[in-house]
A protein has these predicted regions:
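Extended, charge-rich alpha-helical interface modules
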Residues: 3-154
Length: 154
């Protein structure tokens, strides 16, 4: 089982946090990644809530919009009023689902550091699109995601 296979339909999630950790360590070692086995377990199954398709779609829309605004801020130093209006219009009812930092970016209040960091959300958006079955192959995670593909989805 791959690290993200729990999102695929029909995949069985290991029963315990320890089983998940052991499986992840096995995969990482197979890939030649140095592993610190002494790190504590992150979450027990009782603390994990799988997200619904609607929640994943909402997160993808919010992430995409924040990324577009962040890249504009990074490249131009700011968002114009028209660009802010576009973002809010594109989001529609999803505007209220933005995180605090996403809202800062979409409203044009982000500094260059936040904008650059927000641009890296492409990687998490890539995983969301894979979880939705839109991106068919996310690769080995050793390269930057296919940003053009991500943009064309929206």
């Amino acid at each position: 089982m791959g690290v993200f296979d729990i999102f695929k339909k029909g995949a069985d999630m290991p029963k315990t946090a320890q089983q998940r950790k052991d499986e992840s360590i096995k995969i990482l070692k197979k890939e030649g990644v140095v592993v610190f086995e002494s790190l504590p377990l992150r979450y027990d199954n009782s603390e994990v809530t799988p997200r619904s398709v609607d929640e994943i779609i909402t997160r993808a829309i919010c992430s995409f919009t924040a990324i577009m605004c962040a890249c504009t801020i990074r490249d131009n130093g700011h968002l114009s009023e028209d660009e802010i209006a576009w973002a809010k219009d594109f989001l529609g009812d999803f505007y209220g689902d933005l995180s605090v930092k996403e809202k800062e970016v979409v409203e044009g209040r982000a500094d260059i550091n936040l904008a650059v960091n927000m641009g890296w959300k492409y990687e998490s958006l890539w995983i969301l699109l894979w979880a939705l079955g839109i991106a068919k192959d996310i690769g080995e995670m050793d390269k930057i995601c296919d940003c053009e593909f991500v943009m064309n989805v929206f």
